[in-house]
Amino acid sequence: MGSTPTVVLVHGAFADASGYAEVIRELQSQAVEVRAPMNPLRGLAFDADAIARYTTTIEGPIVLVGHSYGGAVISQAAPVVNDVIALVFLSAFALDKGESCASIQEPFPPSLLASTSVPSPYDAPGAPHGPDLFIKIADFHQTFCADLPAQVAAPMAVSQRPLSAAALTEKATVAGWKNLPAWYLLSGQDNAIAPDCQRFMAGRMKAHVEPVSEGSHAAFIARPDIAAGLILKAIKTT
């Protein structure tokens, strides 16, 4: 490998890039260049295009990292990102062509998120159709980040960024992971994406798996050392 890659961190639903703060600090302490753009959360094709366009500002090789819905976005974006060399999924969706974030979960027991997310009473701005989705504030801690202290989860709950419902049912048109090495942080106590669903997606990618047995959907926030370590492995072995 030539020049050191830049790591692009793509957040998922009900969150923003600030969730990566400690991961960023860990990576920067190892002299890794990092970027953490906003994911619009409007629809899979739209969001992937936004991330792909953002990467045109970066010179040299790129490692794309996605959490949750952000995993679907990086896999959709990867084929049109110049010089992407690896994908890292943090408790994330890794879709095949023709799958959606909703359909990939159908063979598995419903997650807690299925009963704690609620639609907005308005159409999602900038989305093709349907409402935005939020997690009920009272249920956010248990659903999204049960391994974080309540005082940390509370501001996350009230500042969550909604995901358009359309984004969950929009089908992937490509599977970027099929042509790239992949790493996967698997959260064993995830209440948003069933751990068995994560195992299935990681297994078919033949990803290098880092299990966090007690990890919530936000395990990368609770254990930034593990998340950053996985990203560093992707950098060093690609």
Model-derived features with residue positions:
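Short beta-strand/loop motif that positions the catalytic acidic residue
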Residues: 184-186
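Short, proline-enriched alpha-helix->beta-strand connector loops that line the catalytic pocket
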Residues: 5, 177-182, 205-208
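Active-site catalytic motif of lipid deacylating hydrolases and related acyltransferases
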Residues: 2-60
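Gly/Ala-rich beta-loop-alpha elbow adjacent to hydrolase catalytic centers
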Residues: 65-70, 74
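Conserved loop-alpha-helix segment in the C-terminal half of the alpha/beta-hydrolase fold
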Residues: 188-221, 233-234
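Active-site nucleophile elbow and catalytic-triad environment of alpha/beta-hydrolase enzymes
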Residues: 155-176
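Flexible "cap/lid" loop of the alpha/beta hydrolase fold
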Residues: 83-128, 164-167, 201
